[in-house]
């Protein structure tokens, strides 16, 4: 098994290295690709030094079985055919192909089998906020069809990249030192603040991030579910949180929901209000599962249920999900 990582120097690329090692992913060879800026850099993987190759239109992907790509939508679109022309399965972390009809959009806990139908040799990784939400929604959907979802996200600074996380650190330092605050990666100062905008606004008043949650959820779950999202950047460092309200076709009790979440693949139930036990990003950065808590019946709709989830957006929201897709393909001997 020969594996490639495209965009290895970024936050998700680095997480790919960690996840592949942690999970003892089966491979005989790992090749790394990057831009002119990162080409020539070396990374250690399983005791070996691997030099980053310059990504270019040549035959470097000949013999590659699986290519994990996380170098941005533009790069993915430009290099799709170069990466796949010799048969490599391209598992792409960007937004480039997610809504293409001939590209499966996969969260293994929800729709793993979709990965088997990939006419272009490409499988898309969903947006981080969508991934953790649909893992939780799957548990409820198995009890009763979900008709409507209202979700508010609380997205950590690192979701905007490593430089954004560094800027948040610096902003806190500047505020506490009574210095002018540097604002480059966000629309406004994030330290001691919330910003109710992630990505650009569309004509309907929702941001692109919010519309991703609508469109991607319906594609992944093969569902007519209606999703209304509000995405907010918060001054946490890592791990995204979401407050989710669902309306199901029949009433779901808290006990039923808790049992479903406890048994749900990729989920950890952390719901003990009496002991103040509930998921928080401070304690869940770097963890694999999606954590669920604050489960309660809606007071205005007998078919409504409300809960709170937290997941690491770089791990399950990106690298881990992609690696799990590859593991599934290996398991069913489809790569």
Protein language model features and the residues they cover:
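N-terminal Rossmann-like NAD(P) cofactor-binding subdomain of oxidoreductases
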Residues: 1-190, 226, 290-291, 295-300, ...
């Amino acid at each position: 098994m020969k594996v490639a990582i495209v965009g290895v120097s970024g936050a998700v690329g680095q997480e790919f290295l960690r996840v592949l090692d942690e999970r003892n992913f089966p491979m005989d060879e790992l090749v790394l690709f990057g831009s002119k800026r990162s080409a020539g850099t070396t990374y250690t993987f399983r005791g070996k030094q691997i030099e980053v190759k310059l990504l270019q239109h040549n035959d470097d992907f000949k013999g590659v079985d699986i290519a994990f790509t996380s170098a941005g939508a533009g790069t993915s679109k430009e290099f799709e055919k170069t990466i796949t022309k010799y048969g490599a399965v391209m598992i792409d972390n960007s937004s480039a192909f997610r809504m293409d009809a001939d590209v499966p959009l996969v969260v293994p806990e929800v729709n793993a089998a979709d990965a088997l139908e990939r006419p272009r040799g490409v499988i898309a990784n969903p947006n981080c906020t969508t991934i953790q939400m649909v893992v939780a929604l799957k548990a409820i959907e198995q009890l009763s069809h979900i008709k409507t979802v209202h979700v508010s996200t609380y997205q950590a600074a690192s979701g905007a990249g490593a430089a954004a996380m560094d800027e948040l650190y610096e902003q806190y330092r500047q505020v506490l030192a009574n210095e002018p605050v540097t604002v480059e990666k966000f629309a406004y100062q994030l330290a001691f603040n919330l910003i109710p905008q992630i990505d650009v606004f569309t004509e309907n008043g929702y941001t692109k991030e919010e519309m991703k949650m609508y469109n991607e959820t319906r594609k992944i779950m093969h569902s007519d579910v209606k999703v209304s999202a509000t995405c907010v950047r918060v001054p946490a460092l890592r791990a995204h949180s979401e407050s989710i309200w669902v309306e199901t076709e029949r009433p779901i009790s808290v006990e039923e929901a808790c049992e479903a979440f406890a048994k749900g693949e990729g989920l950890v139930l952390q719901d003990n209000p009496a002991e103040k036990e509930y998921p928080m990003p401070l304690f869940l950065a770097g963890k694999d599962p999606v954590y669920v808590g604050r489960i309660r019946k809606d007071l205005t709709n007998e078919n409504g249920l409300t809960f709170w989830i937290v997941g690491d957006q770089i791990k399950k929201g990106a690298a881990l999900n992609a690696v799990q897709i590859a593991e599934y393909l290996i398991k069913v001997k489809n790569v």
